[in-house]
Amino acid sequence: PNPFNPETWIPFDLSEAADVTVRVYDMQGREVRRVALGYLDAGAYRGRADAVYWDGRNEVGEPAASGVYVYELRAGEFVERRRMVIRK
């Protein structure tokens, strides 16, 4: 999902069913957005219909500033963190 403007999809795979949550943080470690997907079956979540969608906005609906962000995907005990860039 790099770079993107103003929205992105974050693809992921689950090896087993789990509760899935994605949090987006700015580079100061502040949580910008949380997306709770709930309990999902094992499988590939790669297309626009399945991947995590982030509209580039914070929790109150304001557009996030240009810059580097980190998303954290949690699925059961699994945690993945990756950087992404909003370029406006």
Task: Label the predicted regions.
Residues A17, R34, E62-K88:
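C-terminal tail/sorting-segment detector
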Residues P3-Q28, R34-G38:
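Glycine-centered coil/turn sites that cap beta-strands in beta-rich domains
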Residues E7-W9, D19, A49-A51, V68, ...:
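Intrinsic-disorder/low-complexity, polar/charged segments enriched in Ser/Thr/Lys/Arg/Asp/Glu/Gln
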Residues D26, N58, A75-E77:
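Surface-exposed loop/turn motifs at beta-strand-loop junctions within extracellular Ig-like
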Residues R23, Y53-D55, V70-E72:
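Residue-level detector of beta-strand face positions
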Residues Y39-R48:
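Short proline/glycine- and polar residue-rich coil/turn motifs
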Residues A49-A65:
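Signal that preferentially marks extracellular ectodomain short beta-strand elements
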